[in-house]
UniProtKB/Swiss-Prot annotation:
A cellular-component GO term for this protein: cytosol
Any one Pfam family match given in the protein's UniProt record, by short name: RuvX
Lineage top rank: taxon: Bacteria
Family: Belongs to the YqgF nuclease family.
Protein's name according to its UniProt entry: Putative pre-16S rRNA nuclease
Lineage, opening ranks: Bacteria, Bacillati, Cyanobacteriota, Cyanophyceae, Synechococcales
Length: 153
């Protein structure tokens, strides 16, 4: 499926892992992207408060969630977790969002930025930056109705 380049807007990108969520954001014209410190995931989703603070601080208007599909484009266990978290976040934040196939983004960030054996979350945030750059180039446009499903099981 080919998407059109999305309209410029300030967006938060999330690389969702089981322990941490890598974060990156772009300016309203989608010219520059920056990483933010990765946030730890909590059982009761306390990290949403931190994410909300970043959205308010940088006046972000939507978000994208990386979905790690397998090499055949099929859903993985982690992809299902990411998809569900994206739905939860959209419902909590009331913001439009989209999913982006992030197959191999961690490997790419490790190679591109020379990060090995990272436990700080830096590689997660650089992966979020790669996901964001991919979204800026390829889309898809954010769903204007928060919470609408875009990837089928």
């Amino acid at each position: 499926m080919k998407f059109c380049k999305p309209k410029p807007k300030s967006i938060l990108s999330l690389d969702i892992g089981s322990k941490r969520i890598g974060l990156a954001y772009c300016d309203p014209l989608c010219i520059t992207s920056n990483i933010l410190p990765a946030v730890k995931r909590f059982e009761n989703n306390q990290e949403i408060k931190i994410i909300r603070n970043y959205i308010n601080e940088f006046n972000l208007t939507g978000f994208i969630v990386g979905i790690p599909l397998d090499e055949k484009g099929k859903m993985t266990t982690q992809a299902i977790d990411c998809k569900n978290y994206g739905q939860l976040l959209s419902n909590e934040l009331k913001l439009p969002f989209s999913y982006v196939n992030e197959h191999s983004s961690t490997w790419e960030s490790s190679e591109r930025f020379g990060i090995k054996k990272d436990k700080s979350g830096l590689i997660d945030s650089f992966s979020a930056k790669i996901i964001l750059e991919q979204w800026i180039e390829e889309g898809p446009e954010l769903e204007e109705i928060a919470g609408k499903r875009q990837i089928k099981d």
